[in-house]
């Protein structure tokens, strides 16, 4: 059995608790009509949401460097995303989850699985810097509506597209790859330390 990396398990655990708290507040405010202006009327909700999803994506990107089989990992994420989509479509309490965070992790893991040999040729510091810049530059892309059908998965939602949790490949692949390149940098630093 592989040794666990405690810091990642700890951060993931706290992030899972934060996610549970976020979803509880979301449900209370939007499904049950509780008056929560600190959650619904400020930027706090966006910051809280980002603190959860960005941590998950960064850590998942890091874990790609430790995985023996990223294709299998991507397939597991994709199966979980499909189950979430089916469940949220059938229950219809809120908008169904189309291209949510688990889908995003599946797609990003598949990207790394397919391009890892190329990614490993990029100096880690350049990869980190480039991905953070691209993340910032492409942040607004999925916030617009495009006259292109069937590209919401990539980050170009068309008219009529709705999702209860939307994390398309663009821009979030760049946060995922930031985790990947940071792991590569840490592994090189660890290897070079006497």
What are these regions (language model features)?
Residues 1-194:
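Alpha-helical transmembrane segments and their immediate juxtamembrane cytosolic regions
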């Amino acid at each position: 059995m592989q040794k666990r990396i405690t810091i990642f398990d700890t951060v993931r655990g706290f992030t899972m608790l934060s996610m549970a708290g976020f979803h509880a507040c979301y449900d209370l405010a939007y499904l049950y009509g509780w008056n929560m202006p600190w959650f619904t009327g400020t930027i706090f909700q966006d910051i809280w949401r980002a603190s959860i999803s960005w941590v998950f994506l960064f850590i998942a990107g890091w874990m790609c460097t430790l995985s023996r089989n990223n294709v299998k990992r991507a397939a597991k994420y994709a199966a979980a995303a499909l189950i979430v989509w089916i469940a949220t479509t059938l229950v219809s309490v809120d908008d169904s989850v189309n291209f949510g965070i688990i889908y995003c992790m599946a797609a990003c893991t598949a990207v790394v699985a397919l391009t890892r040999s190329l990614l490993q040729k990029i100096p880690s510091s350049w990869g980190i810097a480039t991905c953070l810049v691209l993340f910032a530059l492409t942040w607004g892309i999925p916030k617009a509506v495009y006259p292109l059908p069937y590209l919401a998965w990539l980050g170009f939602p068309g008219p009529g597209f709705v999702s209860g949790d939307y994390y398309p490949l663009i821009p979030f692949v760049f946060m995922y790859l930031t985790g990947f390149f940071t792991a590569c940098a840490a592994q090189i630093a660890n290897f070079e330390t006497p």
